[in-house]
Amino acid sequence: MPNRALLPSALTQQCRGYPLLDELLTIASNGVRVHLRKPIPRQTRFLRNHPSGLARLNLLSKNTRKEQYFLRCLVADADIIRIWSEIVIIPFVVVDKGDGDHQFTCRTIPDLSFSEDGSVNHCTDSTSVPKASFEHCSRIAREIVRCKQENPECEIEVMAGDVASAYRNAFIYSECVHLFGDHIPEGEATIIEHSAAFGWSGSARIYGVFGGTVDFRHDHNIDPEHPSGFFIYHWVDDHVN
């Protein structure tokens, strides 16, 4: 199920010359395909969520409603499993999120590595996922040193940002969404993820394709003070300018 907001024609024009343009256009046109190297064993029962999911059920439900609002997931009655038995249910884990108030914010992560021998991550064919490479973070240090040498009287500042929500636009191919199911038994709800989940072993590479696109476009913008372009560094869903 591709994200209709990603326009292949516009991406082709704006990102001409981007090394991973073909991979980007495939995601925009078809969505993210998940190829398995072996079938995932059929589940005979719902997997229990991590105890953190029960302890912070209100936040788990809040995050799920937010994802549903932005069309990043489908929330259905738990009984749907009876007619769509191939859904793979993934346990939820709830962890603290940065410096936010832990009573009101959290990060929900599907444990796609459970169980050890029959998980989505274990069965994913990693060779089918687009290749993406990341530069060592020492590049940031070198840029800071360069700026300081050229402007010794100035204080060098770094601007960092997390664009995770933008990467959630990488939607899963419709015939693969059944691999990304979640369950909230207390709410009698089954959740089907639409976007490439953060816990999936292929997500970092998919986000690398998207992050590289941001870098490519940013690097090709110039102004009189930056005739050679702007410094930008990305690592998965984090960007540094």
Each PLM stretch: what is its role?
Residues 1-77:
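Low-complexity, highly charged intrinsically disordered N-terminal segments
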Residues 6, 79, 100, 222-226:
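Structured alpha-helical bundle/scaffold domains in large eukaryotic membrane-trafficking regulators
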Residues 9, 49, 66, 156, ...:
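Hydrophobic transmembrane signal anchors and adjacent membrane-proximal interface regions, especially
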Residues 19-30, 109, 166-179, 211-223:
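Phosphate-binding glycine-rich loops and adjacent basic patches that engage nucleotide phosphates
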Residues 20-44, 112-123, 180-186, 229-230:
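Short, compositionally biased low-complexity segments
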Residues 44-50, 190-201, 234-241:
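Glycine- and acidic
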Residues 55, 59, 64, 68-208:
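Catalytic-core region of right-hand nucleic acid polymerases
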Residues 204-241:
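Active-site palm subdomain of RNA-directed nucleic acid polymerases
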